Amino acid sequence: MSVKKKDLITLQDPEAKYPLPLIEKEQISHNTRRFRFGLPSPDHVLGLPVGNYVHLLAQINNELVIRAYTPVSSDDDQGFVDLIIKIYFKNVHPKYPEGGKMTQYLENMKIGDTILFRGPTGRLFYNEPGTLLIKANKTSEPEKKLVHHLGMIAGGTGITPMLQLIRHITKDTSDETRMSLLFANQTEEDILLRKELEEVATTHHKQFNLWYTLDRPPSDWKYSSGFVSADMIKEHLPPPGEDTLILVCGPPPLIQAAAHPSLEQLSYTKDMIFIY
């Protein structure tokens, strides 16, 4: 008897916890890693709707630590799930001398060690071209939003949910949804997934626009510098409109001090903004 497709979905129950083993680890930069976790069989997929994410759970120093991550792999990938994660080491940031609990835990995992996954989780679903389903909160019914142009503001590892959508939309030749990404980082070295983003921007130049801003740019930098501003949004993202949606993901200062006030200043209404 053939195995049903549904049986090959790893995340069968969003409330359950699934232990998955670390099968590969790649150093992307001095503080960023790609972690590959194995699924129950080589034929399994994760089972994550586009727009959703997973939680990782670990007992660290007698405390249950839970963090949300968007995989950079998709349900086209069988047998594994990939996460790209920035490690927050201790004694690097004066505000956080202890560093990140979960990211340092992941950094110290050995091949074969398992960690608990839970999901899918999320309020955003991208089911068909130009159509998003958005829940106001976890328990509410999703509302449909038709989108012609998606604007994206990402900071640091906040790029991963954007990449999930960018890949999905550009892969589907029938999907004509336009996308514009404003990607904020501290330094040029911090730009995650740059090669892939620039390849997409070249291959799908009519559909996808890419712009960067850096806190500490090099002298020959040709993009923007400083915090995300109203001027940057005005120049590089779609204007307010019924079929516009601006997605925002990144650290709290990016959202609270930069993106949100700037979008409000430019008259984007609540239904035109989605914050991960």
Curated annotation (Swiss-Prot):
Belongs to the flavoprotein pyridine nucleotide cytochrome reductase family. The keyword Cell division does not apply. GO terms for cellular component: endoplasmic reticulum membrane; mitochondrion. InterPro entries: CBR-like (IPR001834), Cbr1-like_FAD-bd_dom (IPR008333), FAD-bd_FR_type (IPR017927), Flavoprot_Pyr_Nucl_cyt_Rdtase (IPR001709), FNR_nucleotide-bd (IPR039261), OxRdtase_FAD/NAD-bd (IPR001433), Riboflavin_synthase-like_b-brl (IPR017938). It comes from Mus musculus. GO terms for biological process: sterol biosynthetic process. The modification N6-acetyllysine is found at K17. The keyword Secreted does not apply. FAD binds at residues 107-137, 146-181. Its cofactor is FAD. Keywords: Acetylation, FAD, Flavoprotein, Lipid biosynthesis, Lipid metabolism, NAD, Oxidoreductase, Phosphoprotein, Steroid biosynthesis, Steroid metabolism, Sterol biosynthesis, Sterol metabolism. NADH-cytochrome b5 reductases are involved in desaturation and elongation of fatty acids, cholesterol biosynthesis, drug metabolism, and, in erythrocyte, methemoglobin reduction. Responsible for NADH-dependent lucigenin chemiluminescence in spermatozoa by reducing both lucigenin and 2-[4-iodophenyl]-3-[4-nitrophenyl]-5-[2,4-disulfophenyl]-2H tetrazolium monosodium salt (WST-1). The lineage of its organism: Eukaryota, Metazoa, Chordata, Craniata, Vertebrata. Residues 15-127 form the FAD-binding FR-type domain. PANTHER family: NADH-CYTOCHROME B5 REDUCTASE, NADH-CYTOCHROME B5 REDUCTASE 2. It catalyses: 2 Fe(III)-[cytochrome b5] + NADH = 2 Fe(II)-[cytochrome b5] + NAD(+) + H(+). This is NADH-cytochrome b5 reductase 2. GO terms for molecular function: cytochrome-b5 reductase activity, acting on NAD(P)H. The modification Phosphotyrosine is found at Y18.
